[in-house]
């Protein structure tokens, strides 16, 4: 396996390559910009240095590479070459548990860092984040009490007890609260006719309803879960006139009224928003003549109702996002199927937000909250606050298995107690007017953060010893600073010896790089043998011969350097995370990261922040859709094995959470969910057939529907096996006996037939018994001659 290089090493190599490119070309950038002061020299490039030594040999440029200045015998102590640096100011170690006091719980390290950056330079620093165990949790349940949620209200009357029981498996310090909303109590959102409809909006439905209200805070966060149940039982529904609700008003007030709600500083904040309808957004208030924008402040009165409901417009998504981030609140949209796609879109615009599908009667809200909390705790995503305009940041994430993922500022699939780290490169563009600024980096939903104090090192130390009206500058015509004269208005020359009023045509040849070329590039005047560049409405003209400017670079979509870089003498110098001739190609890869944890789902290449699908049949923003791909089922099969059965390659490598981010739902049977569904079947290690379906809805939510029970071959019946074995033994014995008997019979028959055959062939003489011998015997005497 190829070794992974740390993000810092990659960044360092890239930086060295960039700096080398500055000097390897045809000319030295430090000596070709026509600078005449130390401050200008440092702004040319991070590789440039300035020599303030008065004894520097004549003709040697004071702005040069440091090694060149040393070769020119510039004293080392006279060289101005500030180096960007990072210094850790505070770094408490990360905590392992969250059961201590707030001051003892640390989830982000370091906490404070100081950066010193010279113009156009960058510095890399690291940040570690850990989700500690047993961290306190605050859950505020915000419910839609419009008439359509009547059955849901009865379903959550015991939610407090059940929720506490489930959440205490994850934390020993839980508090829950309750609030309700309907919509702004003003026409056209409410019924105003007939008059009795104001007090009882359900007058024509033979039901009694509460008068319509905007938002009311019912129960402050408490660890007494029985009180939650009691307060919920006291609630009744109301009724509004139009379909959308005023939920965003309620979210805003529940977020910013931290004292009323009781949010703790040292706890995870979960705001559960339940509804079955759309919601009004900013500018919808104009339907009721409400034009005052939402101010994002707390307006809960002594009666615990939202007092500005009829005078202030609904909040915008941007304002909600800002306030949720400031208060470290994770929003959970628990909404019904008919509006889930809308709230899925909202969640993409609000960091730290999750969406769950609520059943029609809210019976699954308990599991939904627990699952949503698990998703929140399994993800770490960084956000940046108050970043100076002149700074740009680029991120590299080291999540699981110490794998560095360039361009990513989030990690998913984490377990409680896991530690992740981020390598962050801060790069400054130019020289900001404010020399000291600060910004904050924090994980979404965390109270812990990293404060970065930045000092922009734009000045030279030798400027502190400047001599105004110095005799060295032609009897006081300028300030002697850093080894050169900075001439007063109206004076020019290296020693301020030439007045602008003087004019000698013979000096004009010194204002042209070559004979025959325009003087001062036709963008300046030659005074005393020195180019004085014109001012321009488009930008700044610089250079020894006025050959450079900051406005003549290429444009892309109407913006110079695509809006992602600076123009430096006709060339685009791209910001961090951007590259290309036009600076229009981002180097970030987080936009190419698919839900399975792979860049472009492993089916394409990430080019300029977008996936270019290369596998035939694949499509989608991250090449995630590919019904005809051979890996559509094989990869998801590994996720099913890992997440449902806790086995398989991904489980053994502990990468299940990273590569398998789809929701898994168990079903009894697979149904036809449309053309975006892919049915898959495989045999597991137990030789059982597992069937599942991969489905992606219109909102982009991917789900794996897995049949609860795999189809396994039935095991043998023991009794049948025993009887079969015994029967087989008996049959074999009987068969053996029969065969033996048959063989014996055949053998006997053959012998008997042989006997009969031999007996039939026998020829016996029946006249004499060959065994009988007569009593007399007759012998003939051969010698007897008859005499």
From Swiss-Prot:
Disruption phenotype: Animals are viable and fertile. Mg(2+) binds at residues 146, 148, 245. Residues 1-25 form the signal peptide. Keywords: Calcium, Cell adhesion, Cell junction, Cell membrane, Cell projection, Disulfide bond, EGF-like domain, Glycoprotein, Integrin, Magnesium, Membrane, Metal-binding, Phosphoprotein, Postsynaptic cell membrane, Receptor, Repeat, Signal, Synapse, Transmembrane, Transmembrane helix. Residues 202-209 are annotated as: Involved in CX3CL1-, NRG1-, FGF1- and IGF1-binding. Its main location: membrane. Residues 741-787 are cytoplasmic. One of its GO terms (biological process) is regulation of protein localization. Ca(2+) 1 binds at residues 148, 151-152, 276. This is Integrin beta-3. It comes from Mus musculus. The lineage of its organism: Eukaryota, Metazoa, Chordata, Craniata, Vertebrata. The gene is Itgb3.
């Amino acid at each position: 396996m190829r070794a992974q290089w740390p993000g810092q090493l990659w960044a360092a190599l890239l930086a060295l390559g960039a700096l080398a490119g500055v000097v390897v070309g045809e000319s030295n950038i430090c000596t070709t910009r026509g600078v005449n002061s130390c401050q200008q020299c440092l702004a040319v490039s991070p590789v440039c240095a300035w020599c303030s030594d008065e004894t520097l040999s004549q003709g040697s440029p004071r702005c040069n590479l440091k090694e060149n200045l040393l070769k020119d015998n510039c004293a080392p102590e006279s060289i101005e070459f500030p180096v960007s640096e990072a210094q850790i100011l505070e770094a408490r170690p990360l905590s392992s548990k969250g059961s201590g006091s707030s001051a003892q719980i640390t989830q982000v390290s370091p906490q404070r860092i100081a950066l010193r950056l010279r113009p156009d330079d960058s510095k890399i620093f690291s940040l570690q984040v850990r989700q500690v165990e047993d961290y306190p949790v605050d859950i505020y349940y915000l419910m839609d009490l419009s008439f359509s949620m009547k059955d849901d209200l009865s379903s959550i009357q015991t939610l407090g007890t059940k929720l506490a029981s489930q959440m205490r498996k994850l934390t020993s310090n839980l508090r829950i609260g309750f609030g309700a909303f309907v919509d702004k109590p003003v026409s056209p959102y409410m019924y105003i006719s007939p008059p009795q409809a104001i007090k009882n909006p359900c007058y024509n439905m033979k039901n009694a309803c509460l008068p319509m209200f905007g938002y009311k805070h019912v129960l402050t966060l408490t660890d007494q879960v029985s009180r939650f149940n009691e307060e919920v039982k006291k609630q009744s529904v109301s009724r509004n006139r139009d379909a959308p609700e005023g939920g965003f008003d309620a979210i805003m007030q529940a977020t910013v009224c931290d004292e009323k709600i009781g949010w703790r500083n040292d706890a995870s904040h979960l705001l559960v928003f339940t509804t079955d309808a759309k919601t009004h957004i900013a500018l919808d208030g104009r339907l009721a003549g409400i034009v005052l924008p939402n101010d994002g402040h707390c307006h809960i009165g002594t009666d615990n109702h939202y007092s500005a409901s009829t005078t202030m417009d609904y909040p915008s998504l941007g304002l909600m996002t800002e306030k949720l981030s400031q208060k470290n609140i994770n929003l959970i949209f628990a909404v019904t199927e008919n509006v889930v796609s809308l709230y899925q879109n909202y969640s993409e615009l609000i960091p730290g937000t999750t969406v769950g599908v609520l059943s029609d009667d809210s019976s699954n809200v308990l599991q939904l909250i627990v699952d949503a909390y698990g998703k929140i705790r399994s993800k770490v995503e960084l956000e940046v606050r108050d970043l100076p305009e002149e700074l740009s940041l680029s991120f590299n994430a080291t999540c699981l298995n110490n794998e560095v993922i360039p361009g990513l500022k989030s990690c998913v699939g984490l377990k409680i107690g896991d530690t992740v780290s981020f390598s962050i490169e801060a790069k400054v563009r130019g020289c900001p007017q404010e020399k000291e600024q600060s910004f904050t980096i924090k994980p979404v939903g965390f109270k812990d953060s990293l404060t970065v104090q930045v000092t922009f090192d734009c000045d030279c130390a030798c400027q502190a010893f400047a001599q105004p009206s110095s005799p060295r500058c032609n009897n006081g015509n300028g300030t002697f600073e850093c080894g050169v004269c900075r001439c007063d208005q109206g004076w020019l020359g290296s020693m301020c010896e030439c007045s602008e009023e003087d004019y000698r045509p013979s000096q004009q040849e010194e204002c042209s790089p070559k004979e025959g070329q325009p003087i001062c590039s036709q963008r300046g005047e030659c005074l005393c043998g020195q180019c004085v560049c014109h001012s321009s409405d488009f930008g700044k003209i610089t250079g020894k011969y006025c050959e450079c400017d900051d406005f003549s670079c290429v444009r892309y979509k109407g913006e110079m350097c695509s809006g992602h870089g600076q123009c430096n003498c006709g060339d685009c110098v791209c910001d961090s995370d951007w590259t290309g001739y036009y600076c229009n190609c981002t180097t970030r890869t987080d936009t190419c990261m698919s839900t399975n944890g792979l860049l472009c789902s492993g089916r394409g290449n990430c080019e300029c922040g977008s996936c270019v699908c290369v596998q035939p049949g694949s499509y989608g923003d991250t090449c995630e859709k590919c019904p005809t791909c051979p890996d559509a089922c094989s990869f998801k099969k590994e996720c099913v094995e890992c997440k449902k059965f806790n086995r398989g390659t991904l489980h053994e490598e502990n990468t299940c959470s990273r590569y398998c981010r789809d929701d898994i739902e168990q079903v009894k049977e697979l149904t036809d969910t449309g053309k975006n569904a892919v049915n898959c079947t495989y045999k597991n290690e137990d030789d059982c057939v597992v069937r599942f379906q991969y489905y992606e809805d219109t909102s982009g939510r991917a789900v794996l529907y897995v049949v609860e029970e795999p189809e396994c071959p039935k095991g043998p019946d023991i009794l049948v096996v025993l009887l079969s074995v015994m029967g087989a033994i008996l049959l074999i014995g009987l068969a053996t006996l029969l065969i033996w008997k048959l063989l014996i019979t055949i053998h006997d028959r053959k012998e008997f037939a042989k006997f009969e055959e031999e007996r039939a062939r026998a020829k016996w003489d029946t006249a004499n018994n060959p065994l009988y011998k007569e009593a007399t015997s007759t012998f003939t005497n051969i010698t007897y001659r008859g005499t």
